[in-house]
Amino acid sequence: MPSTERVAKVVLVDIEGTTTSISFVHDVLFPYAKNNVQKFLEESWESSSEVKQIVRELQQVPQYAEYTATLRVPPKEVDVQVITGFVRYLIDKDLKVTPLKTLQGLIWQQGYETGELMGHVFNDVPGAFEAWREAGLRIAVYSSGSVAAQKLIFRYSIVGDLLTHLSAHFDTHVGHKQESQSYANIAQSLGEDPSHILFLTDIPGEAAAARSAGLQTIILQRPGNTPLTDDQKYSNELIADFSSLHTLQLPE
């Protein structure tokens, strides 16, 4: 079915490589968190119960033992220096660990609120959001980044506040993005038949997982995205941007 004839009730969008450039995430957000984590922890270590909980959760992930084993002197206690080093270790390895994502979101929040950060979105995103909302569709987000971090990108975007267009947010608490059950969980949470949800992503494995749960899927080929193999191109519907989806309509 051509994109121009497609119907749906919900558009579920990925962020990195779909609404937002991969370079913004990897070249701006990740370095910002890495460079500011020690200062953030020093300021909140004693005063924030949320940070204390994140620190406890970080110590429970499998990579924590791996990291401490690499240290010349094993730490006798957990302190700012140890957690700072571990967070930077996780960022360098691009590991999608839930407490890391939560901590990054808190650090980024400070950056957005001070104006040091502004969320990148591609030029076609605002118009598509408006068109889908006007057509009566709901827009939801599913990203490995925490819900808080998702909201910051759209609230403090380079084109202004886009958060009002979004009706739901999902992160790894609902499941990993290449697992079919995650998309079944999202459909259940949204109260929609999976076939009425259109998932937009740049990752073939995510698209395959969503399709196996009954969702419609399209893969974005944005600048900077990982090139697709011939088999991936053949087995997926592909678009370069959202412009061909402005005519999305609700099912009759």
From Swiss-Prot:
One of its GO terms (cellular component) is cytoplasm. SUPFAM superfamilies: HAD-like (SSF56784). GO terms for biological process: L-methionine salvage from methylthioadenosine. It is found in: Cytoplasm; Nucleus. It comes from the Eukaryota. Signal peptide: none annotated. Its EC number is 3.1.3.77. It holds the Pfam family Hydrolase. Pathway: Amino-acid biosynthesis; L-methionine biosynthesis via salvage pathway; L-methionine from S-methyl-5-thio-alpha-D-ribose 1-phosphate: step 3/6; Amino-acid biosynthesis; L-methionine biosynthesis via salvage pathway; L-methionine from S-methyl-5-thio-alpha-D-ribose 1-phosphate: step 4/6. Its cofactor is Mg(2+). It catalyses: 5-methylsulfanyl-2,3-dioxopentyl phosphate + H2O = 1,2-dihydroxy-5-(methylsulfanyl)pent-1-en-3-one + phosphate. It is an enzyme of class 3 (hydrolase). Binds 1 Mg(2+) ion per subunit. Keywords: Amino-acid biosynthesis, Cytoplasm, Hydrolase, Magnesium, Metal-binding, Methionine biosynthesis, Nucleus. One of its GO terms (molecular function) is magnesium ion binding. Substrate binds at S143, S144, K177. Mg(2+) binds at D14, E16, D202. InterPro entries: Enolase-ppase_E1, ENOPH1_eukaryotes, HAD-like_sf, HAD-SF_hydro_IA, HAD_sf. NCBIfam families: enolase-ppase, HAD-SF-IA-v1. Monomer. Belongs to the HAD-like hydrolase superfamily. MasA/MtnC family. Bifunctional enzyme that catalyzes the enolization of 2,3-diketo-5-methylthiopentyl-1-phosphate (DK-MTP-1-P) into the intermediate 2-hydroxy-3-keto-5-methylthiopentenyl-1-phosphate (HK-MTPenyl-1-P), which is then dephosphorylated to form the acireductone 1,2-dihydroxy-3-keto-5-methylthiopentene (DHK-MTPene). PANTHER family: ENOLASE-PHOSPHATASE E1. This is Enolase-phosphatase E1. The lineage of its organism: Eukaryota, Metazoa, Ecdysozoa, Arthropoda, Hexapoda.
